Amino acid sequence: MATTAEKRTAQSLRICLFSALYRPSMGGVETYTESLARALYEMGAEVTVATCNTHGLAAREREDGVNVVRFPCKPLLGGRFPLVKNDEEAKRLWAHLEDDHFDYVIANTRFYTLTERALDFATRAGVVPLLIEHGSAHLTMGSTLIDPVVQAVEHALTKRDMRYPFVAYAVSRKASAWLGHFGIESAGELPNSIDADAYVAQASARDFRAERGIPSDALMVAFAGRLVPEKGVVELAQATAAIAEHPDANGRAVHLIIAGAGSKQGDIERIGCGNIHLVGRLGRQDLAALMSQADAMALPSRSEGFATTLLEAAACATPAIVTPVGGTDELVSNERFGTIIPNARAETVEAALREAARNPQRLAEQGENVARRVRAEYSWRRTAERALSACRKANEK
């Protein structure tokens, strides 16, 4: 329980969280920022989220007790990389933030232009900000021609960030290690988290197995995320199709439900397998229903800071089949809690899916174990308390 002094301090604090992407955009950073903001607000702080206006919404409003300030921007790469403008509206919004006299500033993710502006804003206000890392590998567009350019830009923008004083944290141990690639030392982790019971309770009444005509004895595997190269979703679909074409004599059929949208949807559709079910981007309630009903969640991703879907599946006692990306060290530390595969090649994923189909009892045990762990160690209240402690430490006089 928080002491009286801690409660008083939290209730008097003004905190600004910067995140280039925020709802209604969907993604791990967006969910992290929203959840941390809500947890800090519930602890009594006055919280503002400063973001880029990628969807043409109001420049300023209050959502569920949290102030939201949206800067005008140019939404490049389909909105994934917004460039903050410096027009008259932007200047008015910066002046508004300056008038709030924030005690603490937290910036999410390197390399966005809003992040650089956030670090400059904090420095001019006399605040040492936290910079939270959300990745564990370079950004990728899935192109051998474009990716080297993207990496060079990422390094250049990170160097610009490093001109300012900040204290770096990360959402997982792998993300902390990745900061070292840029010559940045991590002070520790402020992990991605989930309010597990609340997540499960919000599930809708949709029955995905019935909707898609999936037999009750089939292994139902869920994937949730952007359909882009780095998520490994095409390889996952190829693995599912290979099992459908050459089923095990004693194994269950494997059906894959893919929730999400993105550039690789056409590639998945062209595989032409009846055991692959594309259901589009799902709302939170429907996604919780899918995770609760699935026998396993697959995430053969190239890079994750600490995948939100990993936490969502764990909350639902659904074990993961996942590559060793950020968050697996903590949540899926060994095969008692899920299945770690060494790479995202289709044949590797296929072998893991076949093994899962042959061992339903092991899947159930993994699900029970990871559900207990996520409830014991990964609540948003706990991460918010760590964030406050980190802010205080960074700004000790």
Residue ranges and their predicted role:
Residues 281-282, 289-294:
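Short alpha-helical donor nucleotide-sugar binding micro-motif in glycosyltransferases
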Residues 334-335, 339-346, 355-360:
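Conserved acidic donor-binding segment of nucleotide-sugar-dependent glycosyltransferases
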Residues 266-285:
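Nucleotide-activated donor-binding/catalytic signature segment of Leloir-type glycosyltransferases, i.e.
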Residues 169, 215-231, 237-241:
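Conserved donor-binding/catalytic core segment of Leloir-type glycosyltransferases
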Residues 128, 137-161, 169-170, 177:
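Nucleotide-sugar donor phosphate/pyrophosphate-binding loop at the beta->alpha transition
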Residues 53, 174, 193:
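Carbohydrate-associated surface elements
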Residues 302:
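Aromatic "clamp/platform" in nucleotide-sugar-dependent glycosyltransferases that forms part
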Residues 319-322:
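Short hydrophobic beta-strand element within catalytic cores of glycosyltransferases
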